[in-house]
Every structure is written in structure tokens, then in C-alpha cells.
Amino acid sequence: MQTPPTPLSSLTPHKLRLRRLGIDTYQEPVLYMHRDCRVCHSEGFEAQSRVELALGDRTIVATLNVVSGDFLAPDEAGLSEAAWRLLGAQEGDMVSPRHPAPIESLGHVRAKVYGRHLTQAAITAVIEDVTAGRYSDLQLAAFVTACAGDRLDQEETVSLTRAMVAAGERIDWGEGLVMDKHCVGGLPGNRTTMVIVPIVAACGLRMPKTSSRAITSPAGTADTMETLAPVDLDVAQIRRVVERTGGCVVWGGAVRLSPADDILIRVERPLDLDSQGQLVASILSKKVAAGSTHVLIDMPVGPTAKVRSAEAADLLGRLLGQVGQTLGLRMRVVQTDGLAPVGRGIGPALEARDVLAVLRNLATAPADLAQRSLLLAGEVLEFGGAAPAGGGLALASAVLADGRAWRKFQDICAAQGGLREPPVAAHQQAVHALRSGSVLAIDNRRLARIAKLAGAPGAACAGIDLHVRPGEFVERGQPLFTLHAATPGELAYALEYAASQAETVHVLEDA
């Protein structure tokens, strides 16, 4: 039987009844109070005030939005979806909004704004407050901006990584090697992880891969894997999958590995700021937290990739290696071709289709995805001692060709909850070449933007099916790529943008 609401006459002057408003504010907790609310007046709360709410053993700090009219009663406090989840609230729960304690660590953020070096203790204090949700998005933006560019030195990068690890969960795999691989990113369709993990696991090495969802790309590895099998596994479930199969491909966010990183990324994305120190801390904090011992870094280099020059790649590679070694990781960095997308599909389901084609050894499998996966799998096998120096590629190729990789992938998917086929978009339309000539270049960033406008990764079936590669000759009117969308509106939106970006696939007209 549902508990009746508390009579208004029994409410104390500082208690408000909670309402779930169903407002999506992404990950930012937001509190809504009426302009005539007695607590607003007694506490001096104004719009954008930071307000602390406690319920049972949970406490959150939310940003206040003040409303008028009949949207909310003066004796009610409304919560966004993010705030509701964090507080673990039920309709009608009573709370007493209050001012949060001053955030002492903001002094360290101000110091960094003025160029001061931050100690381990200072960075730890900041990250603890970030993870506890005490920072508003404006305060998070100040920290991210203060650390942007090259403002974090190597010592601060190590300190940031350690603080981010300490703020979350850690997985302990006991004795033995734990292999891992990470791609720096910026290359659409580069879904090699889902081919590498079953190859490596089939050769007897452990590879429990915790992957991310898309941040600025049309698909992350977790998004793509989720079209084939469940990825929201807790630590106990991950351990069972790895004990049974030797590997997994799961979403790291489900097990709170380096939760501060997810919070900082939320603010970094709209600011579009690059920070080598934060990038290195983001990558390595999750590797340390995941219990990895050996980490292979795939670093695509190209004019429209995330890393645009060999010099920048060398600098980032050295920093990753030095920080990783300080944290007890064995590191290996491989620079790869970042000139064009990998495979044909861009978007979760389309990339999953390519992965399945490679693992099943189908004639339609994209050769570049297969070759790149085998090269990196070979590096991991040599790194872990499963193959002699120079013999990794041959072993990886044999495991893929004889079906062992496909069987292992099926085992992993079954252990994670079952293998399924990726969805297909209901709405598709091709974009054609405006002239005959050779494909000179493909702009990774523009192509990724078009795929996102089509609905990826939110709509798993959405994205782009690429039909041409650099160096190929195309005729006028030949399809360059096909847009996939879940709705006609998203398809039209993506087509409009694609039409305005004629050089996304740069065709050089023959003289």
C-alpha cells in the first residue's frame, strides 16, 4: 500500500517534500525550488546557489534553479533525474536544504590558474571534492581550463592520475600478467579492441578490457560492443567472465573506475580543450584501476586525427611511458596510420557489423580493420610473452584464420549475457560524388560529425557506411557513403550538413 503524503500542517519550517520532475540535466544534479519557498527566503538561496541535500546515508550538492507559477508548490523541492538517482530518493521524501560547507580545495584551483605547481595533497583534495559532487560545472570548468595545454608537468600528471585512481574502485587480479590496450582516438571506425581481445584470450593471456562510451566520437568501444552483448557488468560479473573465458569487453563506467575522469570529461567535451596531462591521467588512471600490468597504446597520427603530427605523437608517447612506468605499468606505444577512417562502418551497429565480418572471416570484411587488428594483437602477444619477438603477427593471423578468435568472441559474449545481431537503420540515403577523380583524402572530423548528426551513438543503428578509400578512383554520381538514421528528421539533418561539407571526401578531379 502506498504511503499517504505527509500533511502540510506537519511540515517543519525547513523541510520540503521531494518531487521527481523527470528533467534530464545529463550528469549534473539540479534542484528546483519555488520563488516563494520559505527555505529560499530563510537561507538566502538564489538561482545558481549550491545547495546540500541529505537523505539517509546519502548527501549531494545540487545547483539551484528557481521557478515561478504552478510548476512547483512552495513546500516542494523538485529534482532532476541526475539528482534523483544520486540521492536515491522516493516521491514524498522529506529533505532540509542547507548551505554546503565551503570548498577549501578551490584555493588550489585558483593557485593553478595563476600558474603555481600543485602538490599531491592539493590535487588529491581537488579530486576528492570533484568525485563527491561538491564542484559545480562552472568550478569544474575552471579546474579543467587551469590544467589545459601544457600547464600540468609530469609530476602533477602522476599526482592527478594517483588521485583519480584513489577516488574510485580498483580490481585486483592477483598474480600474473593482465594485458590491456587503449587507442588515443580521433579515428572513426577504429574498433580493433573487439578483434584483439578474443585473439589474445585465445592464446592464453588475460585481457579484461574495460572500455569507454563515446565522448566526442560517433561510437565508443562500449557502445559498439553493447549492440552485440551486455556491457554493464559489475566487478563480480567481470571476474566470472574473465575466469571463464580469459577476456571481456565491458563498460568501465559501470564499475566506477576513476569516476572523477567521467565528471571531468563531461566538462571538457563542450569546452573542446586539449590537455596532455589530463589525457594521460584519464587513460592511465583507468588502466591502474582496472588492474592492468601491461598496456599497449595505439596512437593514430594524421592531419584530422586527435594526434596530428609525428612530433606530437613522440611527445605524448614519452609522457605516457614515463608516467605509466612511475605508476608501475609496463607500457608500449605504437604509432599507426591516422589518415582515414578504419573499416566501412561509423556508428555502433555499423562498426559491430565490421567486427563480426572480420571475426567470421567473411569476404566482405574490411581489410584495413583486419590488418590493423592483427598488427596490434601481435604486439600484445609479443608484449605478454605468448609469441617471440617478431612472431606476434603470424600467431594472431593464424588464430583469426582458423576460427579460434571467433569461437572465443562467442564465448565472451555468452558469458557477458548473450550474443545478438546489431540493429539495422530504417532510413538510409547515399551521398554521391560531385565529380570524377581520385579520392585524395577523407576528413575524419567532418565524417564523425555527420555520423553524430545522423543520431550516433544515441541511436545504435545510426551512422555512416563508407564506400571509398583514399587513392581510389570514383565516377561522378558514384556513392561515397550512405547515411543511416533511426528517424527521417535525423537523416535530413545529417544530409543537409553533409551537402554543405563537400570536401569531407576530397575528390581530386583528373586533369
Curated annotation (Swiss-Prot):
GO BP term, pick one: pyrimidine nucleobase metabolic process
Source organism: Polaromonas sp. (strain JS666 / ATCC BAA-500)
Domain of life: Bacteria
Cellular compartments per GO CC: cytosol
One example GO MF annotation: thymidine phosphorylase activity
NCBIfam families, alphabetized: ARCH_P_rylase, PRK04350.1
Keyword Acetylation: no
EC number: 2.4.2.4
Catalysed reactions, semicolon-separated: thymidine + phosphate = 2-deoxy-alpha-D-ribose 1-phosphate + thymine
Identification of the protein by name: Putative thymidine phosphorylase
Keyword line: Glycosyltransferase, Transferase
UniProt record similarity statement: Belongs to the thymidine/pyrimidine-nucleoside phosphorylase family. Type 2 subfamily.
